């Protein structure tokens, strides 16, 4: 037989084997899709019940349902791994197997998996039930929503904002710190068992594509694309930052540096994530009609249901479907009035089996009007790919899912659209000034959040990678916040805090880079859909509502779910395979030009050395080695605790004896910052019940002077080795370490010898005087041979005498 015959026979056998494997895999996946849908639905319903009614019983039910789903998924994942991907030709079957072969948390031991679930549930509960109390009225303790968020959205009181900001982090962040440390370790273990470098790498895997024709995409490429696009966005952000800083100086004139970073608690919400609420303080042309339509919504008696009905109308106008009847019956669109504790953070839910819901404590504001469009965009995506197999019912990548609703928000926010739904007067006319007002409001929400998002996720990636040891989490967090975002902490935070976890997405285990990529994608999508809708004019004026052609193109992409690479899905709509920041920059170009003119005489950028508390801080330098030599001890957390306690003692003494006031200062009232390895740091003091009430530096200095020796003694140091810069040394004797016995004995003996020598000298002088009185007039030196050069030791120059002391 010829060689070609055997080659043909081998190929036929290989094809038959592949066909057999593929058919078996197809049958396996069909069974999985049927069984998974029911178990997943039960788990999702239990999770919904817990999030809308936080009780121990609902937590127990959620954990039990989740455990059943996880056990089933783990079993099916192991079975999926028996099908070699190399023998699968059908792309859809292959993508499903690839997804199912990722074991997720099921690779952990039963004990560790249970512990991880316990940690995640605990973090969610702490976040949802945490409160901060008003220092001026300790009985007034507020949840985040509603309560603290109202202060952070509306208050112009610097101190009120500060206690709310600090109280939330002290209450929630500190509780979450030990849990988050465990979470990082367990998630990293899970990721590495799934063949990823760490959990950040695992998250980035959502963007990875292995495809032909140039549609592949790597996890490392995501990092590079984010870095590159951020560099392009940075000039626009820096000018927005400079403009906002100048406006904040008008509201808080003594609290803002002309060249410094922005205090984190002044930026419109609890995290400084969105600057939207700064618009009333920063509006360029205040005499123009207000494009924030919150007042109009209130005056027209809008409620939560009206807000979501208007969002639904928008989607329907472009040819997308209505919400289901179950959506309106089962969603939680307002905070319950029956006393239930709930997770208020807005989320869209695809529970499975055609059950779609939104959970949101909606308020009648323009911001929530746009948020409703965003959340309903998620539901539209969920409904569009519902016909896909279970494992492909997801966004092309996580950023796509976030972008869909944002596309609609771009149109819904335009003055033209707001006029059509009666929230702006028909007489409202657009000119250059109203255009700048509109673009600034958009930039506060969209541009202002990009560095926040980029920096937060970069920090987490570094933490998961081990590039930031847990002993430096907060130090690096605020270093990066100052350097990248131009935002500074209003009070210093040590390593007992966990500020990142004070954000919902961090406490609840969400990847966050999706909010960065979605912003880039949404402008790419908007530009493409506006072209399809035949929009003419600047991109920021485009409203795609009522364009069924644009809706049809969008729906084609949404219905793909995860069945094709996101690079291919993106290309089908926008004509490009990767992120491109140009449409975003084009959208804001008129504003960028205006900002550069406004900032012509202002400093653009920020000085990272400035701190809001610098003026009242005292610098400390400690020299252990020079003071104690080989007996120097290590400066550690315990020593810092002792220092803070010593200052608290000094403050108590000062207020008691000088002001006749009993103030219970404790170590937590002493705030330390900028600790350096060579032992230098700054500190300031606040009153015991109010972090926003800083004690003047001069009074702290007086308190230190009163208790200087007590402070020195606590550390076995003196004024020169425990130095408070700006406070002159006292006249108290320096601390001396104990002297050993042999030195004491030696000193006594040598002292006796010296006394003896002195007595001999004195005795000799007396005898000589007697001889002088009794002698004749002869030359007293006649008997002395001067050539011998003898010296009387009693008359030697003091500098020539050497001792062993």
Curated annotation (Swiss-Prot):
Short motif LIR, span: 778-786
Essential for cleavage by ADAM17: annotated span: 652-659
Key word Zinc present: yes
Cofactor: record remark: Binds 1 zinc ion per subunit. Binds 1 Cl(-) ion per subunit.
Catalytic residues identified in the record: 375, 505
GO cellular component: apical plasma membrane; cell surface; cilium; cytoplasm; extracellular space; plasma membrane
Binding sites annotated in the UniProt record for chloride: 169, 477, 481
Keywords carried by this UniProt record: Carboxypeptidase, Cell membrane, Cell projection, Chloride, Cytoplasm, Disulfide bond, Glycoprotein, Hydrolase, Membrane, Metal-binding, Metalloprotease, Phosphoprotein, Protease, Secreted, Signal, Transmembrane, Transmembrane helix, Zinc
Catalysed reaction equations from the record: angiotensin II + H2O = angiotensin-(1-7) + L-phenylalanine; angiotensin I + H2O = angiotensin-(1-9) + L-leucine
Annotated positions of the Phosphotyrosine modification: 781
Residues bearing the modification Phosphoserine: 783
Membrane-spanning intervals of the chain: 741-761
Binding site for substrate: 273, 345-346, 515
Residue intervals annotated with topology Cytoplasmic: 762-805
Residues in the Extracellular compartment per record: 18-740
Keyword Amino-acid biosynthesis in annotation: no
Cofactor(s) for this UniProt protein: Zn(2+); chloride
A GO biological-process term: proteolysis
Stretches for region Disordered: 771-805
Function recorded in the entry: Essential counter-regulatory carboxypeptidase of the renin-angiotensin hormone system that is a critical regulator of blood volume, systemic vascular resistance, and thus cardiovascular homeostasis. Converts angiotensin I to angiotensin 1-9, a nine-amino acid peptide with anti-hypertrophic effects in cardiomyocytes, and angiotensin II to angiotensin 1-7, which then acts as a beneficial vasodilator and anti-proliferation agent, counterbalancing the actions of the vasoconstrictor angiotensin II.
Family: Belongs to the peptidase M2 family.
Subunit annotation: Homodimer. Interacts with the catalytically active form of TMPRSS2. Interacts with SLC6A19; this interaction is essential for expression and function of SLC6A19 in intestine. Interacts with ITGA5:ITGB1. Probably interacts (via endocytic sorting signal motif) with AP2M1; the interaction is inhibited by phosphorylation of Tyr-781. Interacts (via PDZ-binding motif) with NHERF1 (via PDZ domains); the interaction may enhance ACE2 membrane residence.
Protein name: Angiotensin-converting enzyme 2
Native source organism of the sequence: Paguma larvata (Masked palm civet)
Lineage: Eukaryota, Metazoa, Chordata, Craniata, Vertebrata
């Amino acid at each position: 037989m010829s060689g070609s015959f055997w080659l043909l026979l081998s190929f036929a056998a290989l094809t038959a084997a592949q066909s057999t494997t593929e058919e078996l895999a197809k049958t396996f996946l069909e069974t999985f899709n049927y069984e998974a849908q029911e178990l997943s639905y039960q788990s999702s319903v239990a999770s919904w019940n817990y999030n809308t009614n936080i009780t121990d019983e609902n937590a127990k039910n959620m954990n039990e349902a989740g455990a059943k789903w996880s056990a089933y998924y783990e079993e099916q994942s192991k079975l999926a791994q028996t099908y070699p991907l190399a023998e699968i030709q059908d792309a859809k079957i292959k993508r499903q197997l690839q997804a199912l072969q990722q074991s997720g948390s099921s690779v952990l031991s039963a004990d560790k998996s249970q512990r991880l679930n316990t940690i995640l549930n605990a973090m969610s509960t702490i976040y949802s039930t945490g409160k901060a109390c008003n220092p001026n009225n300790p009985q007034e303790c507020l949840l985040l929503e509603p309560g603290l968020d109202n202060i952070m959205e509306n208050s112009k009181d610097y101190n009120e904002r500060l206690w709310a900001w600090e109280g939330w982090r002290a209450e929630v962040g500190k509780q979450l710190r030990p849990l988050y440390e465990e979470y990082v370790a367990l998630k990293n273990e899970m990721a590495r068992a799934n063949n990823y470098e760490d959990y950040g790498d695992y998250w980035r895997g959502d963007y990875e594509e292995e495809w032909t024709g140039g549609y592949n995409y790597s996890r490392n490429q995501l990092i590079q694309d984010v870095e590159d696009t951020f560099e392009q966005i940075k000039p626009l952000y820096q000018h927005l930052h400079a403009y906002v800083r100048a406006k904040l100086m008008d509201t808080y004139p003594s609290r803002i540096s002309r060249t410094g970073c922005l205090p984190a608690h002044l930026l419109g919400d609890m995290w400084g994530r969105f600057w939207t609420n700064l618009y009333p303080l920063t509006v360029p042309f205040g005499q123009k009609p207000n494009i924030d339509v919150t007042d109009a919504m209130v005056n027209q008696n809008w409620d939560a249901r009206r807000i979501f009905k208007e969002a639904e109308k928008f989607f329907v106008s472009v040819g997308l479907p209505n919400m289901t009847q179950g959506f309106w019956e089962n969603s939680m669109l307002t905070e319950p009035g029956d006393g239930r504790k709930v997770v208020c953070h807005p989320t869209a839910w695809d529970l499975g089996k055609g059950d779609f819901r939104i959970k949101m404590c909606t308020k009648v504001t323009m911001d929530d009007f746009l948020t409703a469009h965003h959340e309903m965009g998620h539901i539209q995506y969920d409904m569009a790919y519902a016909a896909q197999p279970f494992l492909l019912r997801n966004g092309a990548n996580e950023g796509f899912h976030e972008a869909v609703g944002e596309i609609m928000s771009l149109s819904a926010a335009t003055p033209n659209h707001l006029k059509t739904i009666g929230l702006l007067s028909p007489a409202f006319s657009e000119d250059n000034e109203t255009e700048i007002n509109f673009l600034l409001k958009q930039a506060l929400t969209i541009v202002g959040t990009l560095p926040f998002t980029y920096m937060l996720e970069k920090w987490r990636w570094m933490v998961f990678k081990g590039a930031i040891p847990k002993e430096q989490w907060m130090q690096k967090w605020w270093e990066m916040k100052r350097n990248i975002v131009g935002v500074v902490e209003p009070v210093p935070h040590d390593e007992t805090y966990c500020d990142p976890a004070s954000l919902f997405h961090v406490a609840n285990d969400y990847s966050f880079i999706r909010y960065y990529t979605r912003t880039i994608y949404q402008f790419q999508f908007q530009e493409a859909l506006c072209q399809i809708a035949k929009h003419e004019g600047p991109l920021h004026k485009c409203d795609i509502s009522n364009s069924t052609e644009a809706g049809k193109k969008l729906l084609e992409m949404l219905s793909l779910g995860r069945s094709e690479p996101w690079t291919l899905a993106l290309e089908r709509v926008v004509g490009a395979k990767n992120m491109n920041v140009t449409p975003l920059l084009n959208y804001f170009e008129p504003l960028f030009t205006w900002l550069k003119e406004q900032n012509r005489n202002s400093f653009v950028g920020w000085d990272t050395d400035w701190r809001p508390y610098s003026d009242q801080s005292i610098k400390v330098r400690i020299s252990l080695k020079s003071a104690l030599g080989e007996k120097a001890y290590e400066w550690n957390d315990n020593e810092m605790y002792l220092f803070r306690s010593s200052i608290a003692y000094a403050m108590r003494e000062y207020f008691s004896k000088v002001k006749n006031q009993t103030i219970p200062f404790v170590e937590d009232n002493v705030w330390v910052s900028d600790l350096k390895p060579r032992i230098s740091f700054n500190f300031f003091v606040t009153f015991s019940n109010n972090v926003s009430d800083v004690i003047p530096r001069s009074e702290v200095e007086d308190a230190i002077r009163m208790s200087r020796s007590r402070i020195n003694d606590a550390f076995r140091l003196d004024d020169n080795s425990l130095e408070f810069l700006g406070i002159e040394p006292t006249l108290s004797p320096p601390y001396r370490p104990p002297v050993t016995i042999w030195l004491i004995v030696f000193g006594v003996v040598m002292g006796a010898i010296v006394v003896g020598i002195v007595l001999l000298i004195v005795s000799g002088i007396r005898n000589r005087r007697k001889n002088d009185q009794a002698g004749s007039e002869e030359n007293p030196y006649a008997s002395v041979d001067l050539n011998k050069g003898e010296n009387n030791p009693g008359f030697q120059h003091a500098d020539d005498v050497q001792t062993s002391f």
